């Protein structure tokens, strides 16, 4: 997998309220061109907050110290104000953090050929908000289930499994009559 700067700790885009806060020349040029064509400032700022390249260029949020522990000088871009809550130091203190989840996922990928070389088989008849699929290689079978929504989703799979490999919520005993929590995801070995 590709992991972009800050993604491994859950860094989020830093919202801007005005074009004066933007450094990306492509965003600035697009803004000026579209203002001349009659687009609203609010609409353009919203687009820049979603797609602007400055989001991927923010300083790494190392700690909750001044400038997120990145520098004692002035950073080239303003920091996301959430750096006091989302930073490397804080993530390393929590064994259930995004950082450690990435480590587990990478380890599973490196240690299990079924992830890389296994056949992919979509589980049919699930809600549009649920992604469920099998990875199969020889005698190895893994089931991956993810609720892609911010709402509870129901799913009933009459499948037994040997072991929960990874989960972002508490481990399950059964896959029958599941009420998947918002954004719940897990993988089991069948």
Specify the residue positions occupied by each region the protein language model found.
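Beta-strand-rich binding/interaction modules
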Residues: 152-170
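Short, flexible beta-strand-to-coil junctions
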Residues: 137-138, 168-170, 189-190
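Loop/helix patches that line or flank the sugar-binding groove of alpha-linked glycan CAZymes
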Residues: 1-142, 148-153
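C-terminal beta-strand-rich structural cap/linker in extracellular carbohydrate-active enzymes
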Residues: 175-190
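Short, surface-exposed beta-strand/loop "edge" segments at domain boundaries and coil↔beta transitions
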Residues: 140-141, 171-175
